[in-house]
Amino acid sequence: MEALSEQEIHQLAMDVVGRDLKDKSFEFLTVNSKPKKNPQFVCLKDKKLHFIVVNAILYPKNPVVFDTTLMNQVKEHGDKFKARTYYAGVGFAHAQDYQKPLSKNAPYVVNYDGLQEII
């Protein structure tokens, strides 16, 4: 089976977070699906601006752990716009063998605990 590319895995993470944001009634202003271009989502909710950084993480790494330097930089940028800043880590693993890479047409497991606000 053909392994998924970094961009394809990032797109899976974007889909997970995008569905979560939609379910929570966020209004999408900007969506950027490039993995290293932050933030990936700029949204409005209750007339407040929100910056969301999405990161796809492969097992065995923990999707809740983030790069504090990067997130502080994004928060500083968000503060200029009076935006709240969030990290959304989405973990993935091959469903049948966590040691295998993710591949096309193979099931996978998702580990997503929601948005973590950067304060």
Task: Report the location of each language-model feature.
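Acidic-basic catalytic patches of nuclease active cores, encompassing PD-(D/E)XK
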Residues: 1-31
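Active-site beta-strand-loop-beta-strand hairpin of nuclease catalytic cores
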Residues: 42-53
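Short acidic/glycine-enriched loop/turn segments that link adjacent beta-strands
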Residues: 35-38
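Domain-level recognition of nuclease-like catalytic cores that cleave nucleotide substrates
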Residues: 84-119
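Short beta-strand-loop-alpha-helix junction that forms the active-site gateway
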Residues: 52-65
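Asparagine-biased alpha-helical interface segments
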Residues: 5, 62-63, 75, 89-91, ...
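Short, charged, amphipathic alpha-helix that recurs within catalytic cores of restriction-modification
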Residues: 64-81
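Short coil/turn segments at beta-strand junctions that form active-site/ligand-binding loops
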Residues: 26, 48, 83
